[in-house]
Amino acid sequence: MTSALIGYTGFVGSNLDRQMRFTARYNSANISEIRGKTYDLIVCAGIRAEKWLANKSPERDWARIRDLLENIKKVNAGRFIHVSTIDVYENSGEGDENTPINPDHCQPYGRHRYRAEILLRELFKDLIILRLPALFGPGLKKNFIFDLLNPVPRVIFPEKFWEILDKVGAADKKLLKSCYRMDAQFNLIPGLHKEALSTLHKILDQVGFTSLNFTHHKSAFQYYPLRRLKSDLEIVLNHNIQLQNLVTEPLPSDELAREVFELEFLNITDKPPLQYNLKSIHHRLWNNQEGYVYSKAQILDWLADFRANYRI
């Protein structure tokens, strides 16, 4: 069987690439080469998952998706598996695969990815869509789990950076300036020693600005372990499921911090806490009776293992 993976250098794609063998692999650098090809199976994890950037620059976000779809239009596939997101739902607090979606009520991030789903349905007769929640696994670069592991912000906007400098002493000011590089915003220089990161964390914690400041302690997210993607995909394929929410039992942020990181997390944000609680009509295939593919207890166990083996 011939197979292709689109997006093999991305977060989801790189994890799937470790778990499965593909005849060909594509990313943004060589995606045009897929035109005119025929594969028995194509897995597409090629749409970027930077929600804040998509909502900030929606035209640019859709242009990237459109360019990818223009290449995909030129390929033949016996079966096409598309990795999407649960953010296509207008209400993250309820719903399942049967819930109607009005993309006009979604933010650009969800609206564009739902639009991509619709276009792919028109292109491929045998299309499987996987809608994923927040993720964790090798290569993690964002979300609350990443922030707990990396409390020093990777990006600080100029106004906030100058505000922080006004609150610290000369030595701390010098360290901050040496560790962040100015572009459109201040970006943390990669490859800093653990000692420098630890000192930065103490400085920023004292002025009340770490990566953890962006999450309300009562926000509850659904986290999916990418280590399970191959086995869960096999369940979907074996049961000929066309649309699958790979959603897990919601995990409150304060509980995650306490149970996995031994941290008492009490942060309050200006915005109300987010509540993700989407379900799947296929949950019994995972021997779960609550509407999820995995329970909170299972996720906590996998998160503890992920933290123990995490490397910056």
Predicted regions and their residues:
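Short glycine-/acidic-enriched loop or helix-start segments at secondary-structure transitions
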Residues: 15-16, 52-54, 90-94, 139-141, ...
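Mid/C-terminal beta-alpha module of Rossmann-like enzyme folds, strongest
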Residues: 209-211, 216, 223-274, 280-284, ...
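A short, well-structured beta->alpha microelement
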Residues: 21-38, 266-270
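NAD(P)H-binding glycine-rich loop region in Rossmannoid oxidoreductase-like domains
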Residues: 32-78, 82-97
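A short, Lys/Arg-enriched amphipathic alpha-helix followed by its capping loop at the start of a domain
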Residues: 15-23, 35, 256-259
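Glycine-/Pro-rich loop/turn segments that contact NAD(P) or position catalytic residues
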Residues: 86-145
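N-terminal Rossmann NAD(P)H-binding glycine-rich loop of SDR-like oxidoreductase domains
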Residues: 1-22
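NAD(P)-dependent short-chain dehydrogenase/reductase
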Residues: 126-129, 133-221, 228
